[in-house]
A protein has these predicted regions:
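Pepsin/retropepsin-fold aspartyl endopeptidases
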Residues: 18-398
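Bacterial Sec-dependent N-terminal signal peptides
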Residues: 1-29
Length: 398
């Protein structure tokens, strides 16, 4: 599970075989979602409790819940499961949810892994994230992810009229598709990518892949960044601008891709190129048919939206209790560095928009303003209030 915010939280595990009972006889279900800073967030009620916020993640094969939410909803672990989490293989406790309700679907006896808190998601999105839902929920159904309606539809048959069918490869209950990176008008590289709706970038490249093909030097420009996981762990990365990126018949020009630096786990795998993230996926309404190994794409209202390009060179994050917003990093040779902003500054506002949890998505959108946009920052440093101005622009280490 990168763009301005580089979140890569990928869970690759053995699928938990289980018996799941659907209490409703209807075979068509609708789950509303919110798109919060380009994260697909759904509300789930567990064992009759108040709804909790879960991230819908096509790059995960099982459901996760944080330990505090597990305790509050009465979940008790009765077993463990091996899990690759943040590049470490861990034995994690498993519990069984008696009833899980989201939208108009009710599922009984659903296993879930109890894990650490999702602190980093909380501090990025400005809301508490309690868990992640993956292919164990939607894999049994034909699934439509409709960004125009902000709805997920599950059913045995969904109308694919107007959609382009694409064959995918299924490995360990996750699906992969071929995509192409263009480094020039005549040079390109095609390889398989995981569909990952919890990757906040356009695409993230595994280190063995981009190193093998010398992609950093072949990029038009790049800047150093930070990958964030669902916890507080971070790792360095690059955001590199390429001539183009192509997914089947859909081409995207001047795309910034995330070049990861993980030496363990999914992004250390030399058999795949990486992931296709939400900054591309959100531009389509998507139908997923795991049984037939196909996905269907149809451009939606977001297709021509601007890409998430950092034009300030700063990264912001809320503190643990979500009451204050700090500048987490200032990238070199960026407008933020030129304006005099520093890591650790308490950010109070940008262009009179208060930097709080209610506005954190707006604040992050401002850091990705089109080049030439004027931003006025109000910060606090050493108990002194300062006002600083910058003009947004692209920047590069190259």
């Amino acid at each position: 599970m990168v763009k301005d915010i580089s979140i890569l939280f990928l869970v690759i595990i053995c699928f938990i075989s289980c018996s799941t009972n659907i209490s409703a006889t209807n075979l068509s279900y609708t789950i509303p979602f919110q798109l919060i800073d380009d994260m697909v967030v759904i509300d789930i009620s567990i064992n009759g409790t108040s709804p909790l916020h879960f991230i819908f993640d096509t790059g995960t094969t099982t459901s996760l819940i944080d330990s505090i939410s597990a305790q509050k909803t009465g979940l008790i672990s009765d077993d463990t499961q091996g899990l690759l989490l943040n590049n470490d293989f861990l034995e994690m406790p498993i519990a069984k949810i008696k009833t899980l309700k989201t939208g108009n679907i009710v599922i009984e006896n659903r296993p879930v892994i109890i894990t650490q808190s999702f602190e980093n998601y909380n501090r990025i999105l400005g809301i508490p994230i309690h868990g992640i839902i993956g292919s164990d929920l939607f894999g049994k159904y034909i699934t439509e992810l409709n960004f125009d309606k902000s709805q997920i539809h599950l059913g045995r048959g969904i109308d694919t009229t107007g959609y382009e069918p694409i064959n995918v490869r299924i490995y360990n209950d996750l699906f992969y598709i071929d995509a192409t990176i263009f480094t020039s008008d005549t040079d390109s590289i095609t390889n398989q990518f995981l569909f990952d709706s919890a990757d906040m970038t356009a695409a993230s490249l595994a280190q063995p892949f981009w190193t093998k093909h010398n992609l950093l030097s072949k990029s038009k420009s790049f800047y150093s960044g930070i990958n964030r996981s669902s916890s507080s762990l971070t790792s360095p990365s690059y955001f590199a601008n390429f001539k183009g990126f192509k997914l089947r018949n859909y081409s995207f020009k001047n795309t910034y891709l995330n070049l990861t630096s993980s030496k363990r786990g999914f992004f250390a795998n030399d058999s795949i190129a990486g992931t296709i993230g939400i900054d591309i996926l959100k531009r389509f309404n998507i139908i997923i048919n795991m049984n037939n190994q196909k996905i269907y794409l149809k451009p939606n209202q977001k297709y021509n939206e601007p890409y998430r390009i950092n034009t300030t060179g700063l990264r912001t994050r809320l503190n643990k209790d979500l009451t204050q917003c700090f500048i987490e990093a200032v990238l070199q040779q960026s407008p933020a560095e030129a304006a005099g902003l520093l890591q650790g500054d308490l950010l109070l506002s940008i262009n009179d928009i208060k930097a709080n949890k209610e506005n954190i998505s707006k604040i992050r959108q401002l850091t990705r303003s089109i080049p030439g946009t004027k931003l006025v920052f109000v910060i606090q440093r050493n108990n002194e209030i300062k006002e600083m101005t910058m003009i947004c622009n692209t920047f590069s280490d190259k």
